[in-house]
């Protein structure tokens, strides 16, 4: 096998059971409708347990009380997580009021969880409320279709409130890409919205009868911001503008962060540059990338099924040539672009249309009424009077967008009274965690519940070493699936067991380098002792403007990951 074509285009062998399930599901229907009426269990049975993921839901249970319920001979306290499809994170205030009401009245936890994929999740939906949540979303023009499992997930778009025209154009493309790659099956409408079954055969011209080999993630990125972390995604359209107007995209393919502890066949990978394309080819190219991965992705091993592994197996040039063939185009050379940061600018920013945008820091994206900080009530009050929209960011924050000067003081007053504008350190603003315990079935260690007190300790270290005005991009993910995007952080903690994490160092501020494991299976005191020493060295030895991650590489503390498929585990 030569370098250009290092491996087979299609992996032969026994297909995974997930492939059987999809094939037999009758285009994602399964027996979900019948299962809904089974009151003997709070969960979904058999294939339906996995099929509901295509409808935007995961079956979970409260792991804090799992053992206690088992002792009482009770089944786990099953409840669903539902994730909304919300391209670019834009939600109207009318929609916000509807989701606020549902969260308060029909979920166990009463919260709205903003995610780092620019949407919101409900946690703790009991089976009896599953159909009503889909109907509520539909009534305000939303849905949960294709936000989980083997499809193109929620499409991200840079939350850029400064260049309003460019953002508007990029956002429209994010919506178009999302719509174009949606499944065509009528299963969602039939099961949840009671729409009549039509006497036609379902067809999936893009996704195919067995859909994609694995999850697939897409972004639209507006440099110089990399807030959406493009290298965590399968397909990325980097906006190229001339005179403030969008003219085309650079395409980058094959990013992804999920690994498995100890499995050296798995690795995080940054996306590869394919080339530049004019706007009119965007949908054809998006479809070509997806169908190439559909046909060439590994359906015999789900741990090796994502686009990043397909690219490494067949070769970047081979994959790129196939995309060109299917789309009927030739990529132009990559146009120049650069990233300067990926954090949100917290507070007020004036847009070019004389409207104001207020970015609110929401720790871990969890919107709830806390003692003395009624965040959820405050946002509801703002939603009732605000004429613009809300935008969820990929950093789990919320932008009150398009505020006229005349409304600014009123909205700020509510935000301040609700604790939505409490001062936080730059370090806290640049730290993030996935949900993890108690609801995530894959969690190995705490993440969301661990982060606030952990950052208290990091803030103390930053103050001790005189760098409180600085920040380190710091992320915690409860398991190596990597939802917290720790594998693109300057300091990444990956859960290994309760109270234990792998410590990764050497990523950079702009999110273009994968960090390497520095220490394995260590406790919080060990993490803090390590970081105390390293932050102290960074404070004294850094060069002007040098971020912590770049410093750890330059100082020889960690070797940079240059080719993750080959050297991540070295």
Curated annotation (Swiss-Prot):
Which is a Gene Ontology cellular component entry for this protein? sulfite reductase complex (NADPH)
Q: Which positions does UniProt annotate for siroheme binding?
A: 483
**Which positions make up the signal peptide?**
none
- One record GO biological process: cysteine biosynthetic process
Q: Which reaction does it catalyse?
A: hydrogen sulfide + 3 NADP(+) + 3 H2O = sulfite + 3 NADPH + 4 H(+)
Question: What Enzyme Commission number(s) apply to this enzyme?
Answer: 1.8.1.2
Q: Which Pfam families match?
A: NIR_SIR, NIR_SIR_ferr
Keywords assigned: 4Fe-4S, Amino-acid biosynthesis, Cysteine biosynthesis, Heme, Iron, Iron-sulfur, Metal-binding, NADP, Oxidoreductase
Q: Please verify whether the record's keywords include Metal-binding.
A: yes
What positions does the entry give for [4Fe-4S] cluster binding? 434, 440, 479, 483
**How many cofactors are bound and how?**
Binds 1 siroheme per subunit. Binds 1 [4Fe-4S] cluster per subunit.
Check the record and name the PANTHER family matching this protein.
SULFITE REDUCTASE [NADPH] SUBUNIT BETA, SULFITE REDUCTASE [NADPH] SUBUNIT BETA-RELATED
Q: What does this protein do?
A: Component of the sulfite reductase complex that catalyzes the 6-electron reduction of sulfite to sulfide. This is one of several activities required for the biosynthesis of L-cysteine from sulfate.
Instruction: Share what the entry says about its subunit structure, partners included.
Output: Alpha(8)-beta(8). The alpha component is a flavoprotein, the beta component is a hemoprotein.
Q: Which family does it belong to?
A: Belongs to the nitrite and sulfite reductase 4Fe-4S domain family.
**NCBIfam families found in the cross-reference section:** CysI (TIGR02041), PRK13504.1 (NF010029)
- What is the protein name stated in its UniProt record? Sulfite reductase [NADPH] hemoprotein beta-component
């Amino acid at each position: 096998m030569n370098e250009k074509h290092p491996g087979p285009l299609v992996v032969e062998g026994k297909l995974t059971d997930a492939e059987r399930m999809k094939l037999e599901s009758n285009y994602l229907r399964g027996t979900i409708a019948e299962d809904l009426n089974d009151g003997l269990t709070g969960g979904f049975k058999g294939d339906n347990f996995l099929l509901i993921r295509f409808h935007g839901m995961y079956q979970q249970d409260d792991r804090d009380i799992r053992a206690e319920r088992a002792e009482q001979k009770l089944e786990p306290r099953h409840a669903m997580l539902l994730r909304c499809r919300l391209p670019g994170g834009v939600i109207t205030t009318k929609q916000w009021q509807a989701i606020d009401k549902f969260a308060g009245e029909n979920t166990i936890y009463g919260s709205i969880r903003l995610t780092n994929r620019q949407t919101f999740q409900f946690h703790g939906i009991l089976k009896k409320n599953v159909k009503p949540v889909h109907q509520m979303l539909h009534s305000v023009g939303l849905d949960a279709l294709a936000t989980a499992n083997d499809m193109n997930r929620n499409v991200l778009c840079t939350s850029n409130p400064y260049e309003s025209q460019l953002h508007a154009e990029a956002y429209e493309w994010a919506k178009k890409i999302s719509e174009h790659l949606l499944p065509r099956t009528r299963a969602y409408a039939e099961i949840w919205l009671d729409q009549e079954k039509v006497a036609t055969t379902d067809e999936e011209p893009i996704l195919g009868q067995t859909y994609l080999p694995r999850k697939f993630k897409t972004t639209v990125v507006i440099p110089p911001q990399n807030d959406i972390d493009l290298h965590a995604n399968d397909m990325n359209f980097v906006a190229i503008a001339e005179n403030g107007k969008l003219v085309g995209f650079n395409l980058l393919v094959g990013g992804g962060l999920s690994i498995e502890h100890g499995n050296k066949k798995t690795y995080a990978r940054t996306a590869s540059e394919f080339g530049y394309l004019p706007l009119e080819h965007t949908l054809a190219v998006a479809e070509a990338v997806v169908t190439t991965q559909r046909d060439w992705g590994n359906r015999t091993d789900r741990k090796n099924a994502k686009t990043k592994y397909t690219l490494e197996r067949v070769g970047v040039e081979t994959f790129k040539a196939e995309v060109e063939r299917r789309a009927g185009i030739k990529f132009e050379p990559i146009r120049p672009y650069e990233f300067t940061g990926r954090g949100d600018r917290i507070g007020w920013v004036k847009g070019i249309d004389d409207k104001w945008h207020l970015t609110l820091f929401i720790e871990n994206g969890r919107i709830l009424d806390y003692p003395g900080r009624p965040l959820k009530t405050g946002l509801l009050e703002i939603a009732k009077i605000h004429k613009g929209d809300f935008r969820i960011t990929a950093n789990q924050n919320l932008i009150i967008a398009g505020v006229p000067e005349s409304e600014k003081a009123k909205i700020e007053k509510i935000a301040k009274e609700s604790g939505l504008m409490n001062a936080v350190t730059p370090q806290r603003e640049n730290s993030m965690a996935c949900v993890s315990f108690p609801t995530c079935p894959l969690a190995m260690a705490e993440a969301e519940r661990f982060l606030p007190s952990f950052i208290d300790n990091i803030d103390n270290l930053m103050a001790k070493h005189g760098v409180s005005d600085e920040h380190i991009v710091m992320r915690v993910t409860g398991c190596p699936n990597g939802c917290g995007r720790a594998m693109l952080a300057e300091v990444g903690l990956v859960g290994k067991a309760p109270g234990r994490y792998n410590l990764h160092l050497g990523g950079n501020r702009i999110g273009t380098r994968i960090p390497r494991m520095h220490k394995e299976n260590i406790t919080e005191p060990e993490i803090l002792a390590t970081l105390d020493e390293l932050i102290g060295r960074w404070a004294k030895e850094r060069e002007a403007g040098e971020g912590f991650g770049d410093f750890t590489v330059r100082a020889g503390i960690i070797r940079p990951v240059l080719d993750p498929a080959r050297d991540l585990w070295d």
